[in-house]
Swiss-Prot record:
GO terms for biological process, alphabetical: protoporphyrinogen IX biosynthetic process
Stated family: Belongs to the class-III pyridoxal-phosphate-dependent aminotransferase family. HemL subfamily.
Assigned EC number: 5.4.3.8
InterPro entries the record matches: 4pyrrol_synth_GluAld_NH2Trfase, Aminotrans_3, Aminotrans_3_PPA_site, PyrdxlP-dep_Trfase, PyrdxlP-dep_Trfase_major, PyrdxlP-dep_Trfase_small
Gene name tied to this protein: hemL
GO CC term (a single one): cytoplasm
Name of this protein: Glutamate-1-semialdehyde 2,1-aminomutase
Reactions that this protein is recorded to catalyse: (S)-4-amino-5-oxopentanoate = 5-aminolevulinate
Biological source species: Salmonella newport (strain SL254)
Keyword Calcium: no
Cofactor(s) in the UniProt record: pyridoxal 5'-phosphate
Quaternary assembly: Homodimer.
Disulfide bridge map: none
């Protein structure tokens, strides 16, 4: 047995499913998950000593690549001053100033520890501010594992085939209305049915938890208009897209102004950080200035803030996002060309540093139904054959892939060459 197999066997006796987040168990593709020893740049190294070109990037945070020296040094320096204080620090102020400067729609920001905390807190705030209970989310979109959001969810919930999680009381779920992504008609119908009851829409501006599904041109502006018409708040969940699709996020890329924004992943540079923020009048409703309660023992942790501050300063450097887009476009075009040579029907969606691979005869993939019609079994074979070639993709047909600026042209070319060999075997 390999070291990964031995560790996985031991882990399953101690940790549910052997992992601390379900998708890591390779449930969506079968087989034994890799146990990682270290990572550097665009590469992961497993406990058996094999190197992989990494397109998971810790599920999004590693936009600069693994083990970036600026982030590593910031963490070491912060740790030498103490691990946690439970009191305000100067770095929290500097971090808030940086985030609000980079994302102009955020007048104020509250730091938390994860994307889930960010989304559940933003929804609570929207409900408190509007005095309404119902929310709209979209089928196949995932906004963390808060109870009200595990209704027709994407990401790991979709991978496990349980988009509606057991353990979520019906009384919670009844306030969550689910519409079809990229379909404004379904959203208007929900508002017309409950015109005075909907507090907010929460949406991934690029749906990255049913693989990678960009918005149609009219979709996000249409959501903004409907929220304005019916007095609801628009929450854009940029946990995945923030600082990746563009410096100011997908909201800037697509030209839509939310009331609240949720951030995670890149904002922590690999440390556990989330954030939510937006309009000053809405954020003023948050405790201690307002009645809507939210708190966290480790929120604004000094080490996490130092990592995030270092990461965002690097991400803000000129040329970063152009490089991400060029590398991702090169990969997408190369995969499509290789698939066509092998007569394999393939769609590759990509925006900025995100991409999604779909085995489908369809011309495009624009919604949950399109994703579910794709050939998941073929993806499983593709995943394992690429893994044998030393390419680590997301171990699920329902998860996006992520590029970093640490990936080289050689890495991209090697990935395309590997895919060409794999397509010949499918």
């Amino acid at each position: 047995m390999s070291k990964s197999e031995n560790l996985y066997s031991a882990a399953r006796e101690l940790i549910p499913g052997g992992v601390n987040s379900p998708v890591r168990a390779f449930t969506g593709v079968g087989g034994t998950p890799l146990f990682i020893e270290k990572a550097d740049g665009a590469y992961l190294y497993d406990v058996d000593g094999k190197a992989y070109i990494d397109y998971v990037g810790s599920w999004g945070p590693m936009v600069l690549g693994h083990n970036h020296p600026a982030i590593r040094n910031a963490v070491i320096e912060a740790a030498e001053r103490g691990l946690s204080f439970g009191a305000p620090t100067e770095m929290e102020v500097k971090m808030a100033e940086l985030v609000t400067n980079l994302v102009p729609t955020m007048d104020m920001v509250r730091m938390v520890n994860s994307g889930t905390e960010a989304t559940m807190s933003a929804i609570r705030l929207a409900r408190g501010f509007t005095g309404r209970d119902k929310i709209i989310k979209f089928e196949g979109c995932y906004h963390g594992h808060a109870d009200c959001l595990l209704v027709k969810a994407g990401s790991g919930a979709l991978t496990l085939g349980q988009p509606n999680s057991p353990g979520v009381p019906a009384d919670f779920a009844k306030h969550t209305l689910t519409c079809t992504y990229n379909d404004l008609t379904s959203v208007r119908a929900a508002f017309e049915q409950y015109p005075q009851e909907i507090a907010c829409i929460i949406v991934e501006p690029v749906a990255g938890n049913m693989n990678c599904v960009p918005p149609l041109p009219e979709f996000l502006p249409g959501l903004r208009a409907l929220c304005d018409e019916f007095g609801a708040l628009l929450i854009i969940d940029e946990v995945m897209t923030g600082f990746r699709v563009a410096l100011a996020g997908a909201q800037d890329y697509y030209g839509v102004v939310p009331d609240l924004t949720c951030l995670g992943k890149i904002i922590g540079g690999g440390m556990p950080v989330g954030a939510f923020g937006g309009r000053r009048d809405v954020m003023d409703a948050l405790a201690p200035t307002g009645p809507v309660y939210q708190a966290g023992t480790l929120s604004g942790n000094p080490i996490a803030m130092a990592a995030g501050f270092a990461c965002l300063n690097e991400v803000a450097q000129p040329g970063i996002h152009e490089t991400l887009d060029e590398l991702t476009t090169r990969l997408a075009e190369g995969l499509l060309e290789a698939a066509e040579e092998a007569n394999i029907p393939l769609v590759v969606n990509h925006v900025g540093g995100m991409f999604g691979i779909f085995f489908t005869d369809a011309e495009s993939v624009t919604c949950y139904q399109d994703v579910m019609a794709c050939d998941v079994e073929r993806f499983k074979r593709f995943f394992h054959l690429m893994l044998e070639e030393g390419v680590y993709l997301a171990p699920s047909a329902f998860e996006a892939g992520f590029m970093s600026v640490a990936h080289s042209e050689e890495d991209i070319n090697n990935t395309i060459d590997a895919a060409r060999r794999v397509f010949a075997k499918l």
